[in-house]
């Protein structure tokens, strides 16, 4: 909203009404020692024209995917967003709607959320989904807590192949709740199965995996799930929704709870947010799900309608006994997800996934032919891959930047042992010419 300062007359009226003689008297309780004595050094205000130009100059200092060709991924992905997504999002009834506190009045909003839940269930092969989470990381943390609640156990196994920042969020959520987190090492870019099997026992609530994982590799979900289930634990999978256009659904692979980052559908990079998380599970765990759930029903006249259902799980009903303290969702971002995926359809999603897979494999193959460059891990991957290089990754990225190319992520930031490794991502937005230009640029670096 606009900020309109009070006039001197208005200030006097307010002070008189509350029985105070001056602003100084109003703030008399604040000690002089903590008050700012000097005036803030704030420049004079700008006209609208001046402000637009100033903000334009400021924005021009950023390096965006509009001007640069980017091969960064690692949880935030550049995908083509059809124009129909933003056009439908701009409808005022969607744009201004928040989480429905008088839900039955907001039938349109509830239906949109219901459609989102339906799509998530179809993608993941699960029985129920919620209205969305803050992001993929918080969704994974909530799924871990669900597992502990369902099994009455206080230990989870977390492979190092899960996104490092997801693991940070897991620690933030779980450690204060007394949940033990045991990290499992990786072998050839995927979960070390032997180490996992040794760590598994009847105290483990769940094994968490990400597939495709942080390195882009496809994990052996069926094998891992069988090991977890044999000890009475659950399998929680974090997935990239685009990959599900080609890969088997987590439900088919034996997952009990599925989460993911929904940003790849309908949501631009946005400098890291806002994004949305999705969370789905098998029917037996639905009552343990966090957040809002929209259900379809019929009114007394037999007309179809939508309601918030199973609300006894939620904070506004049970307070400290709630399944989670999340009391919101990412409805607008989830709507963008829903519109984009609905427009794609099954065939469109499959084609999108195929393009991501093929272009990434072409890029990995061509870069691997360069002297001093090789694919770090052997095994199936989706649209991200790790390159081992004899040249400094920092030097490579600085050289590529001069060609208006944003290179891969330097993995030493998260994995000190991978100090000569770069994580690249290739999506459908890259042409063969783009990839060839990347390869040529890397080939020039000595």
Curated annotation (Swiss-Prot):
Is Oxidoreductase set as a keyword in this record?
yes
Output the GO biological process annotations, alphabetical, semicolon-separated.
Answer: glycine decarboxylation via glycine cleavage system; nucleoside metabolic process
Q: Which GO terms describe its molecular function?
A: glycine dehydrogenase (decarboxylating) activity
**Keywords annotated in UniProt:** Oxidoreductase
Q: Pfam family example for this protein?
A: GDC-P
Reactions listed under catalytic activity: N(6)-[(R)-lipoyl]-L-lysyl-[glycine-cleavage complex H protein] + glycine + H(+) = N(6)-[(R)-S(8)-aminomethyldihydrolipoyl]-L-lysyl-[glycine-cleavage complex H protein] + CO2
> What are its E.C. numbers?
1.4.4.2
The family line of this record is: Belongs to the GcvP family. N-terminal subunit subfamily.
Q: How does it assemble?
A: The glycine cleavage system is composed of four proteins: P, T, L and H. In this organism, the P 'protein' is a heterodimer of two subunits.
Functional note: The glycine cleavage system catalyzes the degradation of glycine. The P protein binds the alpha-amino group of glycine through its pyridoxal phosphate cofactor; CO(2) is released and the remaining methylamine moiety is then transferred to the lipoamide cofactor of the H protein.
**Name of the protein:** Probable glycine dehydrogenase (decarboxylating) subunit 1
Source organism (scientific name): Desulfitobacterium hafniense (strain DSM 10664 / DCB-2)
């Amino acid at each position: 909203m606009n900020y309109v300062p009070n006039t001197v007359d208005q200030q006097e009226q307010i002070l008189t009404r509350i029985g105070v003689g001056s602003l100084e008297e109003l703030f008399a309780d604040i000690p002089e020692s903590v008050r700012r004595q000097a005036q803030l050094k704030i420049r004079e205000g700008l006209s609208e024209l001046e402000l637009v130009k100033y903000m334009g100059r400021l924005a021009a200092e950023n390096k965006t995917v509009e001007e640069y060709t980017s091969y960064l991924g690692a949880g935030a992905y550049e995908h083509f967003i059809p124009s129909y997504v933003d056009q439908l999002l701009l409808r005022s009834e969607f744009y201004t709607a928040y989480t429905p506190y008088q839900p039955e009045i907001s039938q349109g909003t509830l239906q949109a959320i219901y459609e989102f839940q339906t799509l998530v269930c179809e993608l993941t092969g699960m029985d129920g989904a919620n209205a969305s989470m803050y992001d993929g990381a918080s969704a994974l943390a909530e799924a871990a807590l669900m597992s502990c609640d369902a099994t009455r156990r206080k230990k989870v196994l977390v492979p190092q192949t899960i996104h490092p920042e997801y693991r940070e969020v897991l620690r933030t959520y779980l450690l204060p709740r007394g949940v033990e987190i045991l990290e499992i090492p990786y072998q050839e870019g995927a979960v070390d199965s032997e180490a996992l099997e040794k760590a598994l026992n009847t105290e483990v609530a769940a094994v968490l995996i990400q597939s495709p994982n942080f390195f882009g590799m496809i994990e052996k979900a069926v094998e891992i799930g069988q090991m977890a289930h044999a000890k009475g634990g659950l399998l929680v999978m974090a997935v990239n929704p685009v990959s599900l256009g080609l890969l088997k659904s987590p439900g088919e692979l034996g997952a009990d709870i599925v989460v993911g980052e929904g940003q790849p559908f309908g949501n631009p990079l946005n400098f890291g947010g806002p994004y949305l998380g999705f969370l789905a599970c098998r029917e037996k765990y639905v009552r343990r799900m966090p957040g809002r759930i929209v259900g379809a029903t019929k009114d007394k006249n037999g007309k179809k309608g939508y309601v918030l259902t199973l609300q006894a799980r939620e904070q506004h009903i049970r307070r400290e006994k709630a399944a989670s303290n999340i009391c919101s969702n990412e409805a607008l971002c989830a709507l963008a997800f829903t519109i984009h995926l609905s427009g794609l359809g099954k065939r469109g999603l499959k084609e999108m996934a195929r393009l991501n897979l093929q272009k990434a494999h072409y890029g990995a193959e061509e870069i691997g032919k360069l002297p001093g460059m090789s694919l770090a891990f052997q095994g199936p991957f989706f649209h991200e891959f790790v390159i081992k290089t004899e040249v400094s990754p920092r030097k490579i990225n600085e050289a590529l930047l001069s060609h208006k190319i944003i290179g891969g992520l330097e993995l030493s930031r998260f994995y000190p042992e991978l100090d000569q490794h770069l994580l690249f991502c290739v999506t459908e937005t890259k042409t063969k010419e783009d990839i060839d230009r990347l390869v040529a640029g890397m080939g020039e670096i000595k």
